[in-house]
């Protein structure tokens, strides 16, 4: 997929330069601009002895008595509010900016020129009377009228400005959450976290708010009516998302300052439509940087916080949904406004309008094809479409606001997106494109070994890489796999693949066509993800199964080698497999555990044929005793032979009793780390049972580390 990423980056760079001189976002609610526009607005209701061929000309800019009246209006309003001449002088720039649309005559005026014009006009100024027409002299407007116009313009502009402020707060909210996560993450390396986890309030928060799943599902997908499927967040992710949704809802619905006199707009409904359109449009754009950052693989917040990539993808999805909702509200509200304002026919011909409609259609298609059913069955098509439509969405949004404001949100998103892609290219280039050895193990497992760079590249337990198999049929695809540093040969990596649909099936076919052993060049990007800091806990329980073995096995090897030095009391690796064929792929790593201080328990979950009356079943219940390595022996079923034998390993038939395993290690002295990676249902059960244990063992510091990731 790297060629798509590169082309996408180039496309975005070209598109971003397609329009010249984008308008910078300015804050309209500043006093000089509000007063200038308010006074220009109130004087615009006056009939002057003035005519112009320009339909949109402004007497306040081109007719001297009107300009003198505007200066006096601003000056008096500032005096009433207690501002000095220095603030008055700041309005001169606002006058020049507003009048630049109508005339260039004011652009060279100095402060002295404006003061002279004000003083000259003050000499002849007359109080305005309602109904006066064809005025040829400067006028003084009633103070209450001026204040009403100021209130009206202030509400209009402040609503627009506060949308940017609220957008910034949403960004700051997620950054703040990640800073808090970073603090908790780095506390894992200190004794303070152990003491913190024993506090009653903290235990209740972790039991009910941060560790458990929602309705027993997180790694395993939910389904409603067999159409709506997807992944639920964990409760901690849910709390973060809920906080964001509350913020977003409040920011979208609260704080509108409506004008009871309808001085700018003809009716209250016009005000509501325009205010909601502006607020929702700005909030939609404020999501750009976060959406780009959370989807990227080189997210600096992930590095500092230890939060998993799968969590950021969960946030990315919710941000995208709310951005789409904002865009729909923006489009509907602005359409309503144009109808109320009787400007529909002219508005729909505007360039910004047409690109806005295009952007809304594109993001709607993106959201629709991001549904779980498309990602599950057509992932490569989804990914390609997501990137292409994403680039088009950037472009249409750019053109939508290029002459308005809000372009800085897109600048930030493009910068984040481009930097991420450049770093990814650097990562792949640094690793090179080595030739890997592929070996078929059993019927559906491939063991891949490949040389890695000697310097500045080392995979920690639980980390993963994105691999592209450089075969002409599927070289563009990039898929994540957990990686192991080889224990057989220094400087090599080991990746275990299990045949599924897609590229792994094609790779297996290629290996089979070459007699079960083959070589192929790879592009490897990584390593990504953080390694769970389990070495800081007294006892470690590693639970794994299915295709989730690499991370826990790597942890077990590392812990086993350092347990004597770090004072580990107990390290237990529990592997649940459906048949023992998968163990052959990990035989070198599992044999390494024989000489380490690690208890290895293997559960075969494959069903055994029912026994007949003629079968003799001998169940030997052995007393718990330890062999030379301290491994506890368990009940065994003699009719279930083990095709692979590892010294000191305890084999079981059936599924592991997660609750029992957790309580066994929970009774040991010292802190406990529980690490899990395996089948989705198994992972969800371990998560929920660990949450229960946190409350049941008040004197014990227990931490749960989940290395299962799916997006």
Swiss-Prot record:
Induction: By iron deprivation. It is found in: Cell membrane. Residues 415-534 form the FAD-binding FR-type domain. It catalyses: 2 a Fe(II)-siderophore + NADP(+) + H(+) = 2 a Fe(III)-siderophore + NADPH. GO terms for cellular component: fungal-type vacuole; plasma membrane. Heme 1 binds at residues 316, 386. InterPro entries: FAD-bd_8 (IPR013112), FAD-bd_FR_type (IPR017927), Fe3_Rdtase_TM_dom (IPR013130), Fe_red_NAD-bd_6 (IPR013121), Ferric/Cupric_Reductase (IPR051410), FNR_nucleotide-bd (IPR039261), Riboflavin_synthase-like_b-brl (IPR017938). Residues 188-237, 302-321, 375-376, 420-711 are cytoplasmic. GO terms for biological process: copper ion import; intracellular iron ion homeostasis; iron ion transport; siderophore transport. NADP(+) binds at residues 526-529, 677-678. Heme 2 binds at residues 330, 400. GO terms for molecular function: ferric-chelate reductase (NADPH) activity; ferric-chelate reductase activity; metal ion binding. Its main location: membrane. Residues 1-20 form the signal peptide. It is a multi-pass membrane protein. Siderophore-iron reductase responsible for reducing extracellular iron prior to import. Catalyzes the reductive uptake of Fe(3+) bound to di- and trihydroxamate siderophores. Fe(3+) is reduced to Fe(2+), which then dissociates from the siderophore and can be imported by the high-affinity Fe(2+) transport complex in the plasma membrane. Belongs to the ferric reductase (FRE) family. This is Ferric reductase transmembrane component 3. It comes from Saccharomyces cerevisiae (strain ATCC 204508 / S288c) (Baker's yeast).
